[in-house]
Structures are given as structure tokens and as C-alpha cells.
């Protein structure tokens, strides 16, 4: 056990920011299991089990994450300034937002849902400024560094209204107004930052060599802002009494969903290409398969509920099983690498 580690302290020293992507992925799988339990009732029990497991995961990961900033501050700070790894720092804040949604939808606990949402929203606000700031002032970023992982800060902002919109109706006065402001700020800032970065990432895809094998799963992150954006927008519209005409927002969600379907197919094709031509060795980036696809699965169900096109829900349910497969195989691989200590080697 942990034979690949020179010291047990390597667990803390090399605890990369992307670990919380596992919490994001498990949390969205729990929500999707609940959404599709109408097809298979046992999925409701699966959702509850995943929810409790995810809460445990969060606090397990939180310990080395905090200790790293205390014991190996230089390493933690170096990752925050790294042109690739820095984009994964917001995963801890997004994890809080996802857990907030889990507590509200699965745990039926508005208090803890609100606590995690508040922590996540504050964290995302800070990371949405810190991460781009270091990128903007850096003089060493190259085209090699561009990858869909850069979407994570915008995705985190877009995720804010998913649970935040469910909290809005329970507040009054200035707290209600502040929550509305935070939700619309999150979606607006995140969506337009995503559009800007989309152009940069597509530029890299077309005019540069393919992503390294270790970063190949990040192709799936393209689904993150689409799926989360649809879910967040629908939740905001449904919980904003001042929006009296909802249909234009619903139609935009449907159109945006179509863009997501294209990206789903492209991500599958690109993954098969890497598996066949370039290999796809395990890396922590495998967790990039999970949350973005899970967000798109959730968006499929919500779009179906509005337009009542059964084929959309069938597509979502089919992708749910792909999501479950990705999650299971990634969890098994990660557990094995944790046991051997390989995942804690220096990067």
C-alpha cells in the first residue's frame, strides 16, 4: 500500500487541485439518478447512497487540501499560478455548489443546502477573479497550455444558480434581492466568459497539435457550460416571478441543448480516437468525463419536461448509463492508484 510514495507526506504535498472533480462528478450522478428514477425506481436509492458517499468524499478530500496550504504552501501556490492546474482550483467551490444542490434535491435539507451554496458562491466569486488574474498577468502561457479545463471557472459561475434559484423563493427582503443578484451575476459572467474561451479552445483544436493523452478527457468539459447553463437558466426562469414571458428562455435552452448533443457526439468520437491511436492512460483528468456529461444528462431531462419530446429524455437516459459507466471505471481506477500511491507522485 502506497509503495509508490517516498513518504506519507507526499499525499499532502502532491494533492492536486483537481481531486474535487470527483465530488462534482459523484454529486451530479446522484442528481441524475434521482431525475431518472421515474424509469427505474431503484435509482432513487442509488441517488441517496451516492449523496451520502459524496458528503464523505468531500470532507476526506478537504483535509489534505487544507493541510497542503499549511504544510506545503509553495506547492499549493505554484499550482494556483500554473497555466493548466490553476483552472482546477475552483473545483472545491463547485463541489460545494453541487453538494448544495444534493442537499436540497436529495437530502431535502434547505439549511445545509444553503450553507454549502453560500460557501460555494463565495469561493467561486474569489476563484473567478484570482485564476484569470494570474493568467492575464502571466508572460509564459503558450498555445500548448490551452485546454477545455480552462472552462472550469466559467462553469463554476454558471453552476451558482442551479441551487441558488431553488433557495430564492425561501428568502425575503434584501437577502432575496442579494441571492437573485448573485444568481444572475453567476450565469451572466460565466456564460460570456465561456463564449470567449470557446473561441480560444477551438482555435487550439484546429491550429495546434492534439491534446496530450493525459488531458484528452478534458474534451468532455465542453459539455459542462452547456449542460449546467441549461439547468441553471431553466431554474432561474422558473423561480423568477419578474420574468412573465418564459418561452424565449425555454427555446434558447432547447437550441443550446442541440449544441450539447453535437459536443456529446464529438467527445465520443475524440475519445475513441485517443483510445485507438494515442492511448488513454489513467490520470486524474479522467474525472473530466463525469460532471460535464452529468450536467448535460440533467439538462436533457429538464428540456424534456418543458417540451414533452420523449426522444430527448430517451437520449438523456441513454447517456446516463454512459455516465454511470465512466463514473464506475474512473472510481475503480482512482481507488487502485490511491492504494498504490501512484496518484500522489509529483507532477
Swiss-Prot record:
Q: Which GO terms describe its biological process?
A: sulfite transmembrane transport
Keyword Transmembrane assigned:
yes
Q: Which NCBIfam families match?
A: tdt (TIGR00816)
- Listed Pfam families: SLAC1
Q: What is the lineage of its organism?
A: Archaea, Methanobacteriati, Methanobacteriota, Methanomada group, Methanococci
Protein name (Swiss-Prot/TrEMBL): Uncharacterized transporter MJ0576
Q: What is its main location?
A: membrane
Keywords for this protein:
Cell membrane, Membrane, Transmembrane, Transmembrane helix, Transport
Q: Which domain of life is it from?
A: Archaea
Organism field: Methanocaldococcus jannaschii (strain ATCC 43067 / DSM 2661 / JAL-1 / JCM 10045 / NBRC 100440)
